[in-house]
């Protein structure tokens, strides 16, 4: 088989087959790179961010771009590789000048910190050092996921009244004696893997957005493929967060954080690419070596003709053990080679959505996920739900009720009622308007009501956070990054 994009006089052997077209390695790399660069130049705002602007002395001629890099995600790594090639081209064409600089941000946990250090050192040496010898184009930052809790001066305890779904909260100051950790939150409050996955995703996204807000970036480049975006869209619908889809995909408006306008826009440069195409690019460019899950990456579906791989049956989870995100991921991974039009249809349809009209008296954002709230979910749930129990009457019912009270479930409910009464009493005595007017989006309310132990959750107050306080490397040479990398975990350097 020959490449269909090479010139007729010199066709190379085809190595990739995607969208019913055959490519050689070189043509496929160009195909993927062109798709990404097209998105980076999608409108005037982004064109001005990424192109080289003359004169160089003009204020704002060099844009600041934040690129969140996950070393377990092929999309963000491929995106970084293509951005690196673009910057290299600009230095050659414009006398060592570039139109933008890139700050790479990696969020790490205690479990993967050592391997992240190792992979980042290799990535820096191979992909970033060359450009930084010319100019300070790349900066690398690391944030411990626990900084989400460490850098908040106040936390709120949210609890749901199961009689009317009203949300109450109690705020308290944080000091060294009561600092929370991700491990504690997930272990103490989450009842299933879906709730753990949701909270981890929210925390990482908020860390990245806070970092962008506090450091004045012009754009955040997310490495989501068309497949990944479709997965997120369906997951949002399933979780009761469908109203967030339009805001999530919005690349035209500036973002908001805690009802404050930000100076950056969100961009998805990989949104025209399927995940199998990204995995194929990763293999061709030999980028898998930089990921922390190399073995898992090597068996992911791709569109390479000679090296197609599928996960073995022994590695597949049972559906009942999967999170919502994993179920949607499996569905789209299974269909993308043969029915990629379904994926593109999901994304095209979602792109046409607009934000719902708000019925709120004033703009409000969810205190957990920071999404916009358009209607009060507590009122709606209270109207459609019967929550009053049938009274205990017979001797048998009283006996069974007593048994339930003595069980772990009954004791847990007793603890919930005591905590609810305590927080409600505190809320009635509080003069804090925010505490008396707490709002959660429908999705987070359902999460709290069904997947969080005792229907209560301790969460940092967003307006008291300072993410940059402990982010490593602020304008340091790349050669010094790893030496200055502070690990916020016991037993690690």
UniProtKB/Swiss-Prot annotation:
The superkingdom listed in its UniProt entry is Eukaryota
Q: A single GO BP annotation from the record?
A: tRNA wobble uridine modification
Q: Which InterPro entries match?
A: CTU2, Rossmann-like_a/b/a_fold
Q: Which keywords, in A-to-Z order, does the entry hold?
A: Cytoplasm, Phosphoprotein, tRNA processing
| Pathway(s) of this molecule | tRNA modification; 5-methoxycarbonylmethyl-2-thiouridine-tRNA biosynthesis
Q: Which GO terms describe its molecular function?
A: nucleotidyltransferase activity; sulfurtransferase activity; tRNA binding
Location in the cell:
Cytoplasm
Q: Does the keyword Cell cycle apply?
A: no
Residues bearing Phosphoserine are: 489
The Gene Ontology CC terms held by the record are: cytosol
**What Pfam families does UniProt report for this protein, alphabetically?**
CTU2 (PF10288)
Q: What does this protein do?
A: Plays a central role in 2-thiolation of mcm(5)S(2)U at tRNA wobble positions of tRNA(Lys), tRNA(Glu) and tRNA(Gln). May act by forming a heterodimer with NCS6 that ligates sulfur from thiocarboxylated URM1 onto the uridine of tRNAs at wobble position. Prior mcm(5) tRNA modification by the elongator complex is required for 2-thiolation. May also be involved in protein urmylation.
Q: Of which family is this protein a member?
A: Belongs to the CTU2/NCS2 family.
The subunit field of the Swiss-Prot or TrEMBL record says:
Interacts with NCS6 and URM1. May act by forming a heterodimer with NCS6.
Task: Write down what this protein is called.
Answer: Cytoplasmic tRNA 2-thiolation protein 2
Q: Which organism is it from?
A: Saccharomyces cerevisiae (strain YJM789) (Baker's yeast)
């Amino acid at each position: 088989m020959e490449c269909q994009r090479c010139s007729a006089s010199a066709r190379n052997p085809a190595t990739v087959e995607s969208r019913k077209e055959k490519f050689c390695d070189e043509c496929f790399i160009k195909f993927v790179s062109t798709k990404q660069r097209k998105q980076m130049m999608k409108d005037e705002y982004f064109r001005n961010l990424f192109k080289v602007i003359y004169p160089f002395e003009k204020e704002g001629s060099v844009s600041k771009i934040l690129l969140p890099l996950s070393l377990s995600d092929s999309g963000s790594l491929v995106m970084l590789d293509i951005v690196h090639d673009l910057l290299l081209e600009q230095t050659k064409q414009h006398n060592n000048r570039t139109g933008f600089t890139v700050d790479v941000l990696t969020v790490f946990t205690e479990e993967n910190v050592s391997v992240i250090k190792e992979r980042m050192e290799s990535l820096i040496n191979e992909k970033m050092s060359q450009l930084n010898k010319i100019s300070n184009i790349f900066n690398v930052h690391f944030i411990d996921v626990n900084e989400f809790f460490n850098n908040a001066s106040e936390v709120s305890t949210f609890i749901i009244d199961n009689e009317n779904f009203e949300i109450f909260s109690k705020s308290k100051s944080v000091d060294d004696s009561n600092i929370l950790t991700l491990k504690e939150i997930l272990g103490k409050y989450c009842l299933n893997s879906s709730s753990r996955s949701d909270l981890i995703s929210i925390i990482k996204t908020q860390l990245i957005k806070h970092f962008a807000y506090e450091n004045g970036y012009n754009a955040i480049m997310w490495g989501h493929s068309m497949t990944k975006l479709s997965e997120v869209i369906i997951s949002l619908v399933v979780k009761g967060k469908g109203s967030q889809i339009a805001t999530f995909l919005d690349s035209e408006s500036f973002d908001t954080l805690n009802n404050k306008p930000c100076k950056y826009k969100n961009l998805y440069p990989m949104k025209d690419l399927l995940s199998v195409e990204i995995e194929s690019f990763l293999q061709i460019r030999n980028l898998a070596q930089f990921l922390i899950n190399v073995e898992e990456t090597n068996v992911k579906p791709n569109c390479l003709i000679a090296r197609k791989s599928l996960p073995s049956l022994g590695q597949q989870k049972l559906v009942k053990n999967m999170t919502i995100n994993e179920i949607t991921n499996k569905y789209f991974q299974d269909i993308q080679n043969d029915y990629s039009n379904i994926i593109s249809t999901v994304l095209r349809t979602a792109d046409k959505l607009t934000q719902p009209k708000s019925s709120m008296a004033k703009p409000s954002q969810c205190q957990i996920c920071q999404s916009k709230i358009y209607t009060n979910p507590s009122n709606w749930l209270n109207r459609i739900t019967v929550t009053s129990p049938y009274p205990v009457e017979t001797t048998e019912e009283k006996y069974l009720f007593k048994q339930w009270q003595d069980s772990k479930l009954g004791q847990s409910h007793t603890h919930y009622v005591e905590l609810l009464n305590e927080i409600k009493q505190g809320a009635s005595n509080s003069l804090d308007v925010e505490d008396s007017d707490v709002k959660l989006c429908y999705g987070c309310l359902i999460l709290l009501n069904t997947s969080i132990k005792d229907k209560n959750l301790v969460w940092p107050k967003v307006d008291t956070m300072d993410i940059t306080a402990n982010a490593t490397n602020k304008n340091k040479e790349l050669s010094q990054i790893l030496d200055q990398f502070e690990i916020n975990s016991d037993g690690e350097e």
